[in-house]
Amino acid sequence: MPIEIPAPRMTFEVPLEDGARIVMRRHGNPDGVRLLVTHGNGFAADAYYLYWRHLLSKFDVVVFDFRNHGRNVPVVPSNHRYEQLIRDLERVVQEVKVKLGPRQTAGIFHSMSARAAMKHAVEIGWRWDALMLFDPPDVPLKGHPLYTAMEVFENKLTEWAKGRRRHFNSIDELTEEYKQSRATGRWVEGVHELMARSVLCRSADGSGYELVCAPENEAAIYAQALTLDLWPKASEFGGPVKLVGCDPNFKGAPATGPANQALGIEGGYDYSFVEGTGHLLQIEKPDECIRLTLEFLGKHGLA
């Protein structure tokens, strides 16, 4: 049976500075601590449901996709770069506060969105009661022993994304691609189809489906990761941050595992990794990721 996302209690749109709009979905307990939950590059927040469903009974869960992803209508020009993403995030945070009222709020981010949340927090300002970062693509500064490994990793992803298939005749076609890929084959049963459904939209000409996040937009984010010079210490944030990486010791694991372990140690973070996981740890081992989430939120009086 396909995994079905429950209907949200409320939806609203956040208008961005260039005319793009972010579709916000409010789930869970409206009286609870608020959690803003989103996704990684080329993916979509709905596909993380097997992770965030565990938060619905206690928390006010606001789920959203970054521009040109998921339930949002892509825009032209795409303005698909980190400098824009952090301004978008600021707009989202402020609009949520206006629309839903002030509340203790934590952010839960993965990969690209985690990197954007880091950049937002250190460059624009701290807007959270706590921040949880799942396997951000943290690139050390040049000269660091792990810089080259991350450079190779991001360059490979950039080239892969540039050549990525854009059009599919059916959702099943992309589902099978995810199932056959070494990088995505470890996802929990049912998530391959859910992810495919979440990242595809009907083609304008009605001939099938196409990726919401165009391959050139996905590639641009991978390439820009090498230019951010963002390797902050935990003390540079205005509040508690939890850094959770994929398994740095896992055979075939991405370079983000060792990089986040290094940042965790060198930067003085509250750091953990999830054993036996690759980059999509929240949908490979959602139960363990939820355990770490609740432990961290509880430690800071939010759960």
Write out the residue ranges for each language-model feature.
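Active-site loop/oxyanion-hole signature of alpha/beta-hydrolase fold enzymes
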Residues: 17, 66-108, 291
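Conserved HGGG/HGGXW glycine-rich cap/lid loop of the alpha/beta-hydrolase fold
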Residues: 25-74
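Conserved hydrolase catalytic core segment
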Residues: 102-146
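A catalytic-pocket lid/entrance helix-loop region that shapes and gates access to the active site
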Residues: 134-168
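Alpha/beta-hydrolase
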Residues: 165-251
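Conserved loop-alpha-helix segment in the C-terminal half of the alpha/beta-hydrolase fold
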Residues: 235-277
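Catalytic histidine-centered segment of alpha/beta-hydrolase-like enzymes
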Residues: 274-286
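Post-His helix in hydrolase/transferase enzymes
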Residues: 283-295
